[in-house]
Amino acid sequence: MSETTISKEEVAHVAKLAKLSFDDSELTQFTTQLGDILNIFNTLGEVDTAAVEPTYSVTENVNHLRDDVAHNWHQKQGLLENAPLASAGLIKVPAILEDEGE
């Protein structure tokens, strides 16, 4: 089994994409932990599953929920009147992401 390594720079890049910030000690800790996790996946990849039938569920449960059918609600105006901000028939919400060109 070859050991998978991940660099602090890669962890910092993923953290930036996820809008997270870590100090140097946290980056070191997460780099070690993520490397360990990747190595666990390498170990799992070595398991011989050729004789195992693929499944999507380990139980034979049947979905007993109702059909997902769209219905016309006819109360849009009331909803918009109760929304804090509305424009052009839509509810306006504050932006949560900054455009950084990525």
UniProtKB/Swiss-Prot annotation:
Q: Which UniProt keywords apply?
A: ATP-binding, Ligase, Nucleotide-binding, Protein biosynthesis
Q: Which GO terms describe its biological process?
A: glutaminyl-tRNAGln biosynthesis via transamidation; regulation of translational fidelity; translation
Q: Kindly state which reaction or reactions the protein catalyses.
A: L-glutamyl-tRNA(Gln) + L-glutamine + ATP + H2O = L-glutaminyl-tRNA(Gln) + L-glutamate + ADP + phosphate + H(+); L-aspartyl-tRNA(Asn) + L-glutamine + ATP + H2O = L-asparaginyl-tRNA(Asn) + L-glutamate + ADP + phosphate + 2 H(+)
Checking Pfam families in the record gives: GatC
For this chain, the annotated S-S bridges are none
Write out the GO MF terms.
asparaginyl-tRNA synthase (glutamine-hydrolyzing) activity; ATP binding; glutaminyl-tRNA synthase (glutamine-hydrolyzing) activity
UniProt EC number: 6.3.5.-
Q: What does this protein do?
A: Allows the formation of correctly charged Asn-tRNA(Asn) or Gln-tRNA(Gln) through the transamidation of misacylated Asp-tRNA(Asn) or Glu-tRNA(Gln) in organisms which lack either or both of asparaginyl-tRNA or glutaminyl-tRNA synthetases. The reaction takes place in the presence of glutamine and ATP through an activated phospho-Asp-tRNA(Asn) or phospho-Glu-tRNA(Gln).
- Subunit structure and binding partners: Heterotrimer of A, B and C subunits.
The UniProt family comment states: Belongs to the GatC family.
Protein name, entry field = Aspartyl/glutamyl-tRNA(Asn/Gln) amidotransferase subunit C
Organism whose genome encodes this protein: Leuconostoc citreum (strain KM20)
